[in-house]
Amino acid sequence: MSAIQASWPSGTECIAKYNFHGTAEQDLPFCKGDVLTIVAVTKDPNWYKAKNKVGREGIIPANYVQKREGVKAGTKLSLMPWFHGKITREQAERLLYPPETGLFLVRESTNYPGDYTLCVSCEGKVEHYRIMYHASKLSIDEEVYFENLMQLVEHYTTDADGLCTRLIKPKVMEGTVAAQDEFYRSGWALNMKELKLLQTIGKGEFGDVMLGDYRGNKVAVKCIKNDATAQAFLAEASVMTQLRHSNLVQLLGVIVEEKGGLYIVTEYMAKGSLVDYLRSRGRSVLGGDCLLKFSLDVCEAMEYLEGNNFVHRDLAARNVLVSEDNVAKVSDFGLTKEASSTQDTGKLPVKWTAPEALREKKFSTKSDVWSFGILLWEIYSFGRVPYPRIPLKDVVPRVEKGYKMDAPDGCPPAVYDVMKNCWHLDAATRPTFLQLREQLEHIRTHELHL
């Protein structure tokens, strides 16, 4: 560690670059890939006191570990940094200048819409190979077929197989970063050889969620095979690298396969989604203490997002998971963005989304607060669908006229007051998550929830 590097503060996460067996009793041995947490700086800047995942503490060498960083906001990650989209043949040739044998890019075909073109620099000139798209497969020679562009590029990187040269160096599209490189650089890349996929625990339109084993620990793995979908999920994974809180589902790492698969590995939440947990147990099992604790768990996660200028945009009981020891954690960061950005409202869940977000695409912490009020209603109704007996098309017009749902059966009046505060039509008059947490803690302290 050089003298100019600032020391890492307590709580910094590091990932081991090499094995360290330790030579003295106070050393903390570790294996390559282990995640360690800095406890304190020592007198010697080349060594830190750290602890491992089971809480054992000891001294570690700074040059054997790499600090884990969040992927920088605004970084445009790409699984296909060599893909340049709609550019012409002439533009491709300019991009591959000066000539360098094996330099390549892929573009959309101008002559054959729906097909692609592989452009390769070879001995001073550029060759253009049509990539035909037929029956959901891609091929250059109609002999070898590929599922996606990444598989095709990987194949011709290892073997020219009829091309003028094998593919050696990608011409990266300006402004993009290869996802694999960025996750590796920031300390979030995991090793596929150490991941065992055990069984499917959920299916989504994007792919499967599987129970896995990573280095002896149970993990949940989102497996995304389709390259376009995987590209969208990169945004979710990069948001998760920036967030750390005991009530947010924790990202453990990312695996990007050269063939196009993307695996997002997170902590395993044994008891599934909060909505299913509530529905399957009900009033006879879950008392007022338990419901208020879940409400506070979610509120603390949202207060953390609020403080870090992130808006979740899809807060609902289906997107909250429950751990083995009954801790509720917010998940599903697919729509989470920095507070300033806007988004298409095509797929938003109407019953959970604030009126101004549906009407004007205005998302803010205050629109998350509205959703939190709906989530509280879900908790206290034991997982009922909001706005019962109101047709979906009538929900927004009624809400915009000031309609608020009645309190769920048995809901304490103090908790119902909190819900109603979240549902002010004027976003500015809704409370912050900090204020909501204080209100819920007041309810707990004064036993107003029983």
UniProtKB/Swiss-Prot annotation:
It comes from the Eukaryota. Pfam families: PK_Tyr_Ser-Thr, SH2, SH3_1. InterPro entries: Csk-like_SH2, Kinase-like_dom_sf, Non-receptor_tyrosine_kinases, Prot_kinase_dom, Protein_kinase_ATP_BS, Ser-Thr/Tyr_kinase_cat_dom, SH2, SH2_dom_sf. It is an enzyme of class 2 (transferase). It catalyses: L-tyrosyl-[protein] + ATP = O-phospho-L-tyrosyl-[protein] + ADP + H(+). It is found in: Cytoplasm; Cell membrane. Residues 195-445 form the Protein kinase domain. ATP binds at residues 201-209, 222. Its EC number is 2.7.10.2. GO terms for cellular component: cell-cell junction; cytoplasm; plasma membrane. GO terms for molecular function: ATP binding; identical protein binding; metal ion binding; non-membrane spanning protein tyrosine kinase activity; proline-rich region binding; protein kinase A catalytic subunit binding; protein phosphatase binding; protein tyrosine kinase activity. Its cofactor is Mn(2+); Mg(2+). GO terms for biological process: adaptive immune response; adherens junction organization; cellular response to peptide hormone stimulus; intracellular signal transduction; negative regulation of bone resorption; negative regulation of cell population proliferation; negative regulation of ERK1 and ERK2 cascade; negative regulation of Golgi to plasma membrane protein transport. Residues 82-171 form the SH2 domain. Homodimer (via SH3-domain). Interacts with PTPN22. Interacts with phosphorylated SIT1, PAG1, LIME1 and TGFB1I1; these interactions serve to recruit CSK to the membrane where it can phosphorylate and inhibit Src-family kinases. Interacts with SRCIN1. Interacts with RHOH. Interacts (via SH2 domain) with SCIMP; this interaction is dependent on phosphorylation of SCIMP 'Tyr-96'. Interacts (via SH2 domain) with PRAG1 (when phosphorylated at 'Tyr-391'); this interaction prevents translocation of CSK from the cytoplasm to the membrane leading to increased activity of CSK. Interacts with LRRK1. Non-receptor tyrosine-protein kinase that plays an important role in the regulation of cell growth, differentiation, migration and immune response. Phosphorylates tyrosine residues located in the C-terminal tails of Src-family kinases (SFKs) including LCK, SRC, HCK, FYN, LYN, CSK or YES1. Upon tail phosphorylation, Src-family members engage in intramolecular interactions between the phosphotyrosine tail and the SH2 domain that result in an inactive conformation. This is Tyrosine-protein kinase CSK. The lineage of its organism: Eukaryota, Metazoa, Chordata, Craniata, Vertebrata.
